[in-house]
């Protein structure tokens, strides 16, 4: 039996990597809640932006300090984007207490490195150790990125696009569904680009052809769809496919003004409203999510006002707004017209206030309706209350539906009436 204390920072793709890494240690893995009880302490880091780097470094330093006081010191392994961005050698010089540094680019070697350090046999292919509960799981369909946005560090950290073969993903999906998972969520740096590195023109459609008919799959959700890849043909395919696909579209437009988009090096720089209209032409009731960066170098008040009007006009159901931070080694960090930090934060907060009103109005429209709620977990504080999600709520990043009543338990799909709405959350009774 191997006791593991794990921390996964950053995006769902990191969570999948953590689950996979724990899976290579085989069926004898036992997750623990305290470092003192662990044989292995695993920290999977994020290095995408400066605040994530700071959080990752702080987490590692705090772990080192806690381990120093233990009578029996577990193995400390640090993996992920922080290692890929700054390199083993430099990090090891600063933090020699870490036993293993693991980069995403040598992920295939992780099993051997971990197994050798622990003195255990590894299991390849592994069975993922799920950390998301019984209801949903992420399926990472590719790694790396083929785009070159001027603000982004991902290509330098994770490399170019590498799609996972469809037969491997199908086998993983079958395994996850056999364990009771009801919702699969595709994640990648750009899900719409799946298969391009393999020479496939319609790679995502080919993958969906294999996965949508699988027994036990009740929801399939696509995240991280770059605007340029969401063409009319793919949308028609998704419409014709129907359930279990849910018409939830996560489309990171990043900005709305063509001047800013051009400096960002973004595809679809002319008018992101075109892709919104394209989706709504095929799916009038689609749930739309996007992410926005404010305060990008050269963003004027006029650019920001244009962006605000865009958000007000489109009325995204879900919106994430981030203040631009200059990342070392990116073209944008050296661009003229850097915006004052206080101004960037003000623009972010003001745009989120606009979105809060939009979200509240949209969710109020669901009051009195019946929706299928996938129950994720029991509420941590209120007995009898559970936390779940409708089809238009993705885990971890969107609001939730608080639900109670007959048949409500983790992993269940329950028909329920929406009885109350809040700014970002719903309340339902089965």
Swiss-Prot record:
Annotated Radical SAM core domain ranges read: 131-361
Major localisation: cytoplasm
**GO molecular function annotation:** 4 iron, 4 sulfur cluster binding; aspartic acid methylthiotransferase activity; metal ion binding; protein methylthiotransferase activity
Give the matching InterPro entries. Answer: Elp3/MiaA/NifB-like_rSAM (IPR006638), Methylthiotransferase (IPR005839), Methylthiotransferase_CS (IPR020612), Methylthiotransferase_N (IPR013848), Methylthiotransferase_N_sf (IPR038135), NA-bd_OB-fold (IPR012340), Ribosomal_uS12_MeSTrfase_RimO (IPR005840), rSAM (IPR007197)
Q: Which CDD domains match?
A: Radical_SAM
Which stretches make up the MTTase N-terminal domain? 2-119
Q: Where in the cell is it found?
A: Cytoplasm
Bridged cysteine pairs (disulfide): none
Tell me the keywords, alphabetical order.
4Fe-4S, Cytoplasm, Iron, Iron-sulfur, Metal-binding, S-adenosyl-L-methionine, Transferase
Cofactor, how bound (note):
Binds 2 [4Fe-4S] clusters. One cluster is coordinated with 3 cysteines and an exchangeable S-adenosyl-L-methionine.
Question: Which reaction equations make up its catalytic activity?
Answer: L-aspartate(89)-[ribosomal protein uS12]-hydrogen + (sulfur carrier)-SH + AH2 + 2 S-adenosyl-L-methionine = 3-methylsulfanyl-L-aspartate(89)-[ribosomal protein uS12]-hydrogen + (sulfur carrier)-H + 5'-deoxyadenosine + L-methionine + A + S-adenosyl-L-homocysteine + 2 H(+)
Q: Where does [4Fe-4S] cluster 2 bind?
A: 145, 149, 152
Q: Which Pfam families match?
A: Radical_SAM (PF04055), TRAM_2 (PF18693), UPF0004 (PF00919)
Is the keyword NAD assigned to this protein? no
The record's Gene Ontology biological-process terms are: tRNA modification
Q: What is its EC number?
A: 2.8.4.4
Q: Where is the TRAM domain?
A: 364-430
Alphabetized Gene3D superfamilies for the sequence: Methylthiotransferase, N-terminal domain, Nucleic acid-binding proteins, tm_1862 like domain
Q: Which PANTHER family match?
A: RIBOSOMAL PROTEIN S12 METHYLTHIOTRANSFERASE RIMO, RIBOSOMAL PROTEIN US12 METHYLTHIOTRANSFERASE RIMO
What this protein is reported to do is described as: Catalyzes the methylthiolation of an aspartic acid residue of ribosomal protein uS12.
- This chain belongs to the protein called Ribosomal protein uS12 methylthiotransferase RimO
Source species: Oleidesulfovibrio alaskensis (strain ATCC BAA-1058 / DSM 17464 / G20)
The gene designation is rimO
């Amino acid at each position: 039996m191997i006791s593991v204390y794990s921390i996964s920072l950053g995006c769902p793709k990191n969570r999948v990597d953590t689950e996979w890494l724990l899976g290579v240690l085989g069926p004898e893995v036992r997750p623990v809640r305290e470092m003192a009880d662990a044989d292995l302490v695993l920290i999977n880091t994020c290095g995408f932006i400066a605040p994530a780097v700071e959080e990752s470094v702080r987490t590692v330093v705090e772990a080192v300090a806690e381990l120093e006081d233990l009578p029996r010191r577990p193995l400390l392994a640090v993996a992920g984007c922080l290692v890929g961005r700054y390199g083993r050698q430099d990090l090891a010089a600063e933090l020699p207490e870490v036993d293993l540094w693991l980069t995403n680019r040598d992920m295939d070697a992780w099993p051997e490195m971990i197994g050798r350090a622990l003195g255990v046999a590894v299991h390849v292919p592994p069975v993922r150790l799920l950390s998301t509960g019984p209801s949903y799981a992420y399926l990472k369909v590719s790694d790396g990125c083929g785009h070159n946005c001027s603000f982004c560090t991902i290509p330098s950290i994770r490399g170019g696009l590498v799609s996972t073969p469809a037969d491997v993903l199908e086998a993983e999906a079958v395994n996850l569904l056999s364990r009771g998972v009801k919702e699969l969520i595709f994640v990648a740096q750009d899900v719409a680009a799946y298969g391009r590195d393999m020479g496939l023109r319609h790679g995502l459609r080919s993958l969906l052809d294999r996965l949508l008919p699988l027994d036990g799959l009740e929801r399939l959700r696509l995240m991280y769809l770059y605007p340029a890849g969401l063409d009319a043909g793919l949308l028609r395919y998704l419409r014709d496919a129907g359930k279990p696909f849910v018409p939830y579209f996560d489309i990171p437009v990043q900005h709305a003004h063509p001047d800013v988009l051009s400096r960002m090096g973004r595809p679809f720089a002319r008018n992101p409203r075109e892709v919104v209209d394209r989706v709504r032409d095929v799916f009038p009731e689609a749930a739309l999510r996007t992410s926005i960066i404010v305060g990008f170098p050269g963003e004027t008040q006029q650019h920001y006002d244009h962006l605000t009007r865009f958000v007000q006009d489109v009325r995204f159901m879900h919106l994430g707004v981030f203040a631009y931070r200059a990342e070392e080694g990116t073209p944008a960090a050296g661009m003229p017209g850097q915006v004052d930090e206080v101004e960037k934060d003000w623009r972010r907060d003001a745009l989120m206030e606009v979105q809060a009103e939009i979200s509240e109005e949209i969710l109020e429209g669901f009051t009195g309706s019946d929706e299928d709620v996938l129950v994720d977990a029991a509420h941590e504080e209120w007995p009898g209350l559970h936390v779940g999600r409708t089809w238009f709520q993705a885990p971890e990043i969107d609001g939730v539906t608080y639900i109670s009543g007959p048949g409500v338990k983790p992993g269940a799909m329950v028909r329920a009436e929406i009885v109350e709405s809040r700014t970002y959350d719903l309340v339902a009774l089965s």
